Design a protein with these regions (language model features):
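C-terminal-biased regions
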Residues: 2-68, 72-144
């Protein structure tokens, strides 16, 4: 929880440092928005990872049922072509997630952090905090 100064406006940890211009605040806001989008991408990758694993295990039941129904050729094809298959050459989904996390995602987070440190003393969401101040409803219970 940040410390309020003057009762209205952003709390101290969301106030722009003295001398920080509007364009830089907007640029930091866009960089933060981009990172938030990449966070969503990461979540989708984890979803794909988990769903692919779930599908792979469901194939075991399909194979068993095809075998019981006398469709050995189809059961064997599923075993041969699908169960445990790399989703892209040389990679299971966990490897894709790890490479994303250790490469693109890690670098993206680091660049965003460095930009905040360099221009805003590490403060986050300055653009959004100021936007909140401009767009906040006039209701008395929304003054904080």
């Amino acid at each position: 929880v940040g410390t309020r100064i003057g009762g209205d406006g952003p709390d101290e940890r969301h106030r722009r440092p003295e001398g920080l211009d509007d364009l830089t605040v907007e640029a930091l806001g866009k960089l933060s928005e981009a990172l938030e989008t990449v966070e969503r991408v990461r979540g989708h990758l984890y979803s794909a990872h988990q769903l692919t694993g779930t599908a792979d295990f469901a194939l075991d039941a399909a194979v068993s049922l095809f075998m019981q129904a006398g469709h050995t050729e189809m059961a064997e094809r599923i075993q041969r072509e699908l169960i445990g298959r790399n989703v892209i050459p040389g990679h299971w989904t966990f490897q894709i997630v790890e490479e994303f996390d250790d490469g693109y995602y890690a670098e993206f987070r680091e660049v965003e952090r460095q930009a905040r440190e360099r221009f805003a003393g590490g403060r986050r969401h300055l653009y959004e905090a100021e936007l909140r101040g401009r767009r906040r409803t006039a209701r008395p219970d929304y003054s904080e």
